[in-house]
Amino acid sequence: MGKKITKQDRESQISNICNDKNLSFVGWIGEYTNIKSTLTLKCNKCYYTWSPRLDNFLRITAQKCPACAGKARWTKEEREEQIKSKCAEKGYNFLSWSSTYINKDSKIILKCLKDGCIWDVSIHHFINHDTGCPDCASGGFNPNIPATFYIQKLTYQGTHFLKFGITGKDVLERMRQQSNKSLCEHSVIFSHTFSYGSMARGLEKVVKDSVNTGVLDKRILPDGYTETCHYSELETILSLTNSFIQENIR
């Protein structure tokens, strides 16, 4: 009969595995007695917590996070804890759900505590791809200095689309940056400069919430494809823009 492994030795064994797999050993459920005892683990990547039996965990194939492996179903409450943990790490606030929570593709609304930017992103991209504040990623959009809301006409294989957005740079310069890697022909058909970038950001959000966006594939327009829509939305966007300007510029 083999020597009984002590609790201390077991925890050392578990910790070594966890360090190698980017996991954290949280503790035991009940007292440790033998190989059939249950432990609690936490994934350091996605923050998922689960409780396997020790003998199951020690199998090589079981030494990975079930959520990262796509084998776990998250409750809404678990997702919110996961999101809040990630937000605390990144310097963001979790404001709300953009729509009803269904799965990893559901969208959330976040706020950057550094620059005040508010944006929406899917859980999958935020947690697994580390997608962060769009303003910080673009070099620091400043909400306190002038910025321009613009509309571009894009032509791809004979079909017209729209691309809207905001920039603290010259509109034509921004268009040249976007067109460098684009398969579309670009032209600016409307622009309005606000005294404060926060106003331009507010208008952009109004438009995003009102039209169907992301109609062009990222392979066609790598920079800014999420703010594309059908050309038939032009009148709607111009109407929203005029109303926004009249209501906010006194």
UniProtKB/Swiss-Prot annotation:
Up-regulation conditions: Expressed in the late phase of the viral replicative cycle.
Function: Putative endonuclease.
Protein name, UniProt field: Putative endonuclease
GO terms assigned for molecular function: DNA binding; endonuclease activity
Source organism phylogeny: Viruses, Duplodnaviria, Heunggongvirae, Uroviricota, Caudoviricetes
UniProt keyword annotations, A-Z: DNA-binding, Endonuclease, Hydrolase, Late protein, Nuclease
InterPro entries cross-referenced by the UniProt entry: CapR_dom
EC code(s) of this entry: 3.1.-.-
Nuclease is among the record's keywords: yes
